[in-house]
Amino acid sequence: MFAIITRNFPPELGGMQNLMEGLSNALLNHGPVKVFAENYDNAEEYDENSKLEIERISGFKLFRKYRKANRIKEFMEENEIRAAFFDHWKSIENIETSILKKTRSFCLIHSKEINHPLGTSLNKRVLKSLSKADHVIANSRFTKELALKLG
C-alpha cells in the first residue's frame, strides 16, 4: 500500500492538486493507495467517484495538522506501507521520524515554499522537516539549486 499525505487534492482546483491526483492514480497500477487530504466543499462527491481510498481531515487549521499527523501515525503503525509521499514540507513536519523509518518517504519541494533566508526559524523548520524524508524531489532545476543553496 502507498500513502499520499497532502494539503492539496481535488476537488480543490490547482496545479498541485492535479499533480497529487495524478501521482495517486499512477500508483494504483502498483498497489492500493490511501490518500490523507484536507476536506473541501464537494469532496464527498469526488471521493465517491474515485478509485482511491481518501480520508479527509477537517477542523480548525491549528488543530487539523496535529490530528492529521496522529491519524497518519496510527495508520502507518497498523499497515504495511511501501512508500509515503508528501506534497510539502509542512505535510511531513509533524510526522514522527520513528514512524517514517518504517517505509520509504518522498517529499516534494517548491521554490516559493523553501525560499527563507539561512538561519531563520522558517529555514530551520524546513530543513528539519525535509531531513525526515528519504528522498526530496524538487519540482524544477531552479528549486533544486535553491534548496542546495539554502541548506
Regions found by a protein language model. Name each.
Residues 86-92:
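Short His-centered aromatic/hydrophobic patch
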Residues 12, 63, 92-93, 105-120, ...:
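A short, histidine- and acid-enriched strand-loop-helix "catalytic/donor-clamping" loop
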Residues 70-79:
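Short, well-structured alpha-helical segments in soluble
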Residues 133-151:
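A short, active-site helix/loop in glycosyltransferases that binds the activated sugar's phosphate group
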Residues 77, 128-129:
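Structural alpha-helical scaffold elements that stabilize or flank donor/cofactor-binding regions
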Residues 82-83, 135:
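Structural motif
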Residues 6-13, 19-64, 143, 148:
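N-terminal strand-loop element at the rim of the active site
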Residues 1-3:
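Extreme N-terminal starter segment of soluble prokaryotic enzymes
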